[in-house]
Amino acid sequence: MTSTRKAPFSHNTMSRALFLLLLLCLPGLETSAATPLRQQLVFDYGWKFHLCQDTTEVVSALQQLGITDMPHFGTDASAPKGGATIGETEPEIQTAQTEAAVGVGAPTGSANGGKETNASAAFADVQLPHDWSIALPIDPKQGGSAGYLPGGQGIYTKDFTLPSSIKSNDQVAVYFGAAYHRATVWLNGHKLGYHMYGYTGFEMDMTPYLNRKGQNRLVVHLNTEEKSRWYTGAGIYRHAYLHVTGRQHIKTWGVYAKVTCEDGQWTIAPVVELTNGEGCKVSHQVLDAQGKVHIKAFSGSAVMDNPRLWTLDDPYLYILRTCVRDARGQLVDQTDTRFGVRSFSFDADRGFSLNGQPMKLKGMCLHQDVGTLGVAVPDRVMERRLQALKDFGCNAIRSSHNPASEEFLNICDTLGLLVLDEAFDKWKSGFYAPFFDDNAVQDITDMVVSHRNHPSIIIWSIGNEVQEAWNEDEVGVERARMFNDLVHRLDPTRPTLVACQQGFQDKFGEVTDLVGYNYLEPRMVADHKRHPNRKLLVTEAFVYYSGLRENIVRDWVERNPWYFVEDNDFVAGSFLWAGVDYHGESSPWPAKGWCSCPFDMTLEERPQAAYYHPAWKPEEPYLKLVVRDNCFDQAVGTDHWQYPIMADTWDLPFSDGRTVQIRCYTTCDSVQFYFPMWSNPQLPLKPRVTADYPDHTITLQLPARHGKVLAVGYKDGQPILRDSLVNRGKVAGLKMECDRPSLVTLPQELSAAGGSQQNVAHVRLTLVDKDGYRQQMDPRLITAEVEGQGTLLGIETGDFRRDGFTGQSIKSYFGSALLRIQSTHETGSIRVKVTVEGLPEPYYLDIPVKGRP
């Protein structure tokens, strides 16, 4: 399908953003669950993995697995193009698919007859998602960009037999949400194809080579020897599925619901792509969120009367049910696609609006890794992260610097978070440079076609800080124009941008729909005057400091950068760098990652993050006391990307004549402070930044004296809030808090995908004194053990200076640690046992595990 570009992003334009295509055929009006027309089956379990030392070992292991058609090991121009792509492909870019990718030749039996080989005997059992790099020893030779963690080459194998629900004439494909990176896939010794990019999903047809009555062996080789400038992880780190359909079926990513609004009338006009669709007819229904019919069967288009709009507070999702009948009128395929109805616009003078309501994008940039999990992140862990960011006041996420996962976008759709979905970092100057020319167009196509049904997405970023901006020639501009035009053909409803650094906005400002500024906010004022029709937003902002000059990043002042956005209507919003600590781009050794974000790896809010509560939620009562002092043992960040060192404790070194700075972040009108033998008058705090109290922050210098600092906040003359800093006693106990009263089991292998993802519990461990208050300044070794129907995914703190990311023990950090525990496939109970250095008895917590609903 080739779309003509319309005038995008006006108030009358409705985003055709919809939820991800759900491939499992749900019970409905057209078919029964007993005989599904299509299946999406869980394929995460029963995998084996082997990390190879070098290419020679890779070749040997693959040969022992019965494979003779080797992967391409080089990075030269002869490297293969990514294959087996799915979704809509423009005619001029079909060269990105190879013959090997679609499986040409006659099927044969299982390689080695399913017998154990020397290579397979050395493989370890793993389940997907899986990141092999995070479990490797820290190696300073690997460099700080990768978090000092190695990559290398790895091989996955999986032996499986088809379930009886798959009929003899069904088409069967394997789908990977992502695999990092340079994936080569074989089935029963036959190469199915390649997929080079490590951040997009891909599907490979297994039908020609399947052994339908016996065992099959799937083999995946990944090569992560090229380093990126942050931690990428390594492995099949997103979910895998079997896709089962009839010969005539809807393509994966093949439903695109086009929703428009003209003169107040909403219309849905779905576009459907079929495989072997000769003689087929397509019809649709629209269901509400409860499954009741909203629009009866139609083909072509239909009017949606008074739809319930998708908003940040009410992210309502409809269901588009698509049915395909063959020439005889027999139903051959059916699928449900969730979508949201909403409009948005960017304006050069007024910024951003959603459903006609002006608002600022209060955004955060996110890398996809999570602490000890690396990039293999269970859905529940990501849900907890995104919910915490929304509760903090964030309303938009930038997927830095790669396409987000389908599961991530599903969560944003249901929580009501907006998304800037990003294709690449650096273009040809980055780690992907050897493969960029042959694969980039297909990679962008995959991102847009697979994600355009998500109402959360409002912007496509075609690149970040691209090195081509430095070139004097027009290569970078022409590449941006090509990518921009491609995106608009695939989705004419969302704007594009390049996130630019060092004042290169002019180079791409006439190409993309929006102009992204990484820092350099002062330049935006001048650019708005020079180019009044451009639509501007801050794609990266410091978390604490503000820039001073137009073209110099390393010139800053201590001021909350949000107030620049708030004070300038033409700025659509900003995205903090970054929202949550991440591996790689490491702060000075011994830190193994970036540790200057509002949230640490455990998702505990830093005291410094209080800086943003009055800025992002000025209408909510808030008061927070912190101490700014270099006595606290914290990993420091990089230059002005870091926070000043702060903590919310009064357990600090005391000495005569020593003073410390107290900071009070508040939305109160005034605050009364109390200190032993001392008090001062009420201090008026105005609702906006003033010369007296900038950034809603009152600062005091107080003696470092044993006792208590108390602050009482007043609104309209009445006390409404209080906070205190108090000396705490010695560690006397442990508090264990679990975020889930119970868990559900993991889904069974080859079962229907979907259902509850509440299979991970987070247990917060807090050291407390005899009165139950947190003691932050007495670190203790904590050891955790898990028994029963659960496994310990990891134990960690907010300290990135640890020596590795495996094991069951860790030193507490400011009195805290976190456990992540996952259920198994069996019902029962999980018993968590925790011992603390210096405490005589262990502590226990029981978590019930229930069956899947």
Residue ranges and their predicted role:
Residues 265-298, 320, 660-684, 708-713, ...:
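Beta-strand-rich binding/interaction modules
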Residues 123-124, 129-162, 166-187, 193-196, ...:
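Active-site-adjacent substrate/metal-binding segments within catalytic domains
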Residues 145-252, 277, 417-420, 543, ...:
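Accessory beta-strand-rich segments of carbohydrate-active enzymes
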Residues 39-59, 71, 179, 227, ...:
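Substrate-binding clefts and catalytic carboxylate motifs of secreted carbohydrate-active enzymes
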